[in-house]
């Protein structure tokens, strides 16, 4: 326990909270341009080809972003919106692309959980 004199000389340090999504700079989403669209394999117990794109954001950052849902229409130079949210089994992927906004189409034939995949209500 510190004495009062010690605390007067050097107050207690506040714990600084570090952001999980620094590239967003406290914004809910950011716009960017795809520089590369590719697939990658997940970490050890899992096996798949995960769809990922490299995005150059409007603030100059370049980040990897996961493309959720079945099938996508993204290619190089597509303009996308990204949000925070990491993919646990892909190291270095800390962002998600928002489906159904800008150049990213919604997931086709999606019936449930549509709002997360930018799909309109079926007639």
UniProtKB/Swiss-Prot annotation:
Q: Does the keyword Ribosomal protein apply?
A: yes
* Gene3D superfamilies the UniProt entry points to: Nucleic acid-binding proteins
Q: Which Pfam families does UniProt cross-reference here? A: Ribosom_S12_S23
Q: Which intervals of the chain are annotated as region Disordered? A: 100-123
**GO BP terms:** translation
Classification via InterPro entries? NA-bd_OB-fold, Ribosomal_uS12, Ribosomal_uS12_bac
Record-linked NCBIfam families: rpsL_bact (TIGR00981)
Q: Which HAMAP family match?
A: Ribosomal_uS12_B
Question: What's this protein's family per the entry?
Answer: Belongs to the universal ribosomal protein uS12 family.
Subunit record text? Part of the 30S ribosomal subunit. Contacts proteins S8 and S17. May interact with IF1 in the 30S initiation complex.
Q: What does this protein do?
A: With S4 and S5 plays an important role in translational accuracy.
PANTHER family in alphabetical order = 30S RIBOSOMAL PROTEIN S12 FAMILY MEMBER
Name this protein carries in UniProt: Small ribosomal subunit protein uS12
Species of provenance: Ectopseudomonas mendocina (strain ymp)
Please name the taxonomic classification of the source.
Bacteria, Pseudomonadati, Pseudomonadota, Gammaproteobacteria, Pseudomonadales
Which gene produces this protein?
rpsL
């Amino acid at each position: 326990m510190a004495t009062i004199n010690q605390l007067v000389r050097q107050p207690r340090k506040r714990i600084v909270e570090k952001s999980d999504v620094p590239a967003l700079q406290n914004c809910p989403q950011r716009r960017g341009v795809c520089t590369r669209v590719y697939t990658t394999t997940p970490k050890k117990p899992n096996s798949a080809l995960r769809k990922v794109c490299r995005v150059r954001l409007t603030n100059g950052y370049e980040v990897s972003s996961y493309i959720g849902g079945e099938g996508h229409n993204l290619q190089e130079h597509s303009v996308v919106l990204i949000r925070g949210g990491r993919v646990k089994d892909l190291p270095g992927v800390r962002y998600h692309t928002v489906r159904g906004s800008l150049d990213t189409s919604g997931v086709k034939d999606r019936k449930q959980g549509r709002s997360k995949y930018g799909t309109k209500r079926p007639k």
